[in-house]
């Protein structure tokens, strides 16, 4: 089964998905929506779960949790937690929160090193951040299984 990962923001949501063996994370898209219109994100998640080529293949949602460097919560952390609560009422899959500190900055650095300009970075950074979050999650899961 696959894992679907989200990097949620106020106006964009990066999506990534794992392979069926849960070893590789693949960026899917930067989804743009009206500010704070999270039902649009929920509808997009339902699309991936029910209508896309991944229909019936996802067993868990991974949601990036933007903690501060000292692990305290920010306004954005609270927004993501509230979204997770609403999402749980709309889907039956388990939702896991994954520390996403520095994921967007790391994604921007990778894109800069790749020669992407500002406009190109804007179109790719959130899906790449979701991919990095999912890679961290998968790595942690494999590490826990091997111990």
Swiss-Prot record:
GO terms, molecular function: nuclease activity
SMART domains: YqgFc (SM00732)
Keywords attached to this entry: Cytoplasm, Hydrolase, Nuclease, Ribosome biogenesis
UniProt EC number: 3.1.-.-
Cellular component GO terms, alphabetical: cytosol
InterPro entries xref list: RNaseH-like_sf, YqgF, YqgF/RNaseH-like_dom, YqgF/RNaseH-like_dom_sf
Subcellular location: Cytoplasm
Main location: cytoplasm
Entry-linked SUPFAM superfamilies: Ribonuclease H-like (SSF53098)
Biological processes per GO annotation: rRNA 5'-end processing
Protein function: Could be a nuclease involved in processing of the 5'-end of pre-16S rRNA.
Family to which this protein belongs: Belongs to the YqgF nuclease family.
HAMAP family on file: Nuclease_YqgF
Name of this chain's protein: Putative pre-16S rRNA nuclease
